[in-house]
């Protein structure tokens, strides 16, 4: 239970700090934008990132995602970081397979899901660029949180979840009436709990 309570603690910490900064800025005559818009009520992982730590998400999008090509083009660095991450993780998992096979299964499964998200996409060329650039952005965003393997894996999990959601959304568009689908009600909390502990 404590592991899942940590997701609430992270939100309260970050949102609380942001609200204090907004309040102090107002006392000095400055208006700062809202930094959290009830992210845990999001319909999907993409919307979550539009509502969570908006200043960081905007910075990552403007200065990392667009810099490595965004949806338009692929760059060396856009392909390099995800390839390096998956390659290093696979090498590590193979190296420790005498102790346990679980990291190897997880790594191969994550790589398979990432490739599958590209292969089943309606526009493969665009999704290759987009998914690799998004994965690079999330890996570097994880590294920004801390130079620790757990933050890099956290970034990779979010990059993978975003790639899967983008491909999934091509086949099952979001309802325009604002209501959450049954699938969204199941998958959103699952992705959040898995990636935030």
Predicted regions and their residues:
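Membrane-embedded transmembrane alpha-helical bundles that form the catalytic cores
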Residues: 1-197
């Amino acid at each position: 239970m404590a592991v899942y309570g940590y997701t609430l603690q992270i939100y309260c910490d970050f949102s609380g700090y942001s609200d204090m900064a907004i309040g102090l800025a107002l006392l000095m005559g400055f208006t700062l934008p809202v930094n959290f818009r009830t992210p845990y009520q999001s319909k999907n992982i993409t919307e979550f990132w539009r509502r969570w730590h908006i200043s960081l998400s905007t910075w990552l999008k403007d200065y990392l995602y667009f810099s490595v090509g965004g949806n338009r083009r692929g760059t060396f660095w856009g392909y390099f970081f995800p390839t390096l991450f998956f390659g290093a993780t696979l090498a590590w998992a193979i190296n420790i397979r005498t102790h346990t096979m679980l990291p190897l299964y997880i790594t191969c499964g994550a790589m398979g899901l990432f490739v599958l998200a590209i292969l089943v996409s309606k526009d493969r060329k665009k999704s290759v660029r987009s998914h690799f650039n998004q994965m690079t952005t999330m890996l570097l965003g994880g590294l920004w949180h801390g130079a620790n393997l757990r933050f890099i894996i956290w970034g990779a999990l979010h990059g993978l979840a975003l790639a899967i959601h983008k491909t999934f959304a091509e086949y099952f568009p979001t309802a325009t009436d604002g209501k959450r689908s049954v699938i969204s009600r199941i998958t959103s909390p699952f992705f959040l709990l898995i990636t935030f502990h």
